Regions:
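Conserved positions within compact, well-structured domain cores
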Residues: 1-167
Length: 167
């Protein structure tokens, strides 16, 4: 199917969506060659995390609902190597182009996020998922090793360098 990408590294498949002239994966990446607990932070070594999991067994982590629904949380060294061949982390300019196409900063969030309250906390007002991007509230791993905000907020890396240490 031309609207599905299969990652040859692990067999995970992802819907492909086109918004304006940009091509995006329609789900969060699930590539995870290893897994770390939230207390195992690093600015230099790749670390892969599954929200709420505090272990190192990849098979156990992949069996969790969070993994199959929300994907993997990556620190920066993992994020830069997680993309399959032919894909890249969107730059700040690409995110800005997407945001502008979706109506600007005040409107884009609703147009790009999943509708309903299965994954987003109620009331999730304004969510239309107009383009099939289906953004999910993955939360993040704070730089003190605390998982935060699943169900409330979604965060994505940009390929454009800036400060910050959260995953």
């Amino acid at each position: 199917d031309e609207n599905v990408f299969v990652d040859a590294r692990d067999g995970n498949s992802y819907p492909i969506i086109t918004i304006a002239d940009q091509v995006w994966m329609g789900e969060n990446l699930r590539y995870m060659p290893s897994v770390s607990g939230p207390g195992t932070l690093s600015d230099t070594d790749p670390k892969y995390y599954v929200y709420g999991y505090d272990g190192t067994d990849v098979a156990v982590a992949k069996a969790l609902d969070y993994y199959s629904t929300y994907g993997v949380l990556y620190n920066w060294p993992a994020a830069v190597n997680a993309c399959p061949s032919g894909w890249h982390i969107a730059t700040d300019a690409e995110w800005t182009q997407l945001t502008n196409f979706a109506g600007g900063e005040n409107a884009a969030g609703g147009k790009l996020k999943e509708t309903g309250t299965v994954h987003w906390q109620a009331p999730n007002n304004g969510a239309t998922d107009e383009y099939g991007f289906s953004a999910l509230p993955t939360g993040f791993l704070k730089d003190n090793g605390t998982f935060m905000y699943v169900g409330q907020y979604g965060y994505w890396w940009t390929g454009t360098e800036s400060g910050g240490n959260n995953t």
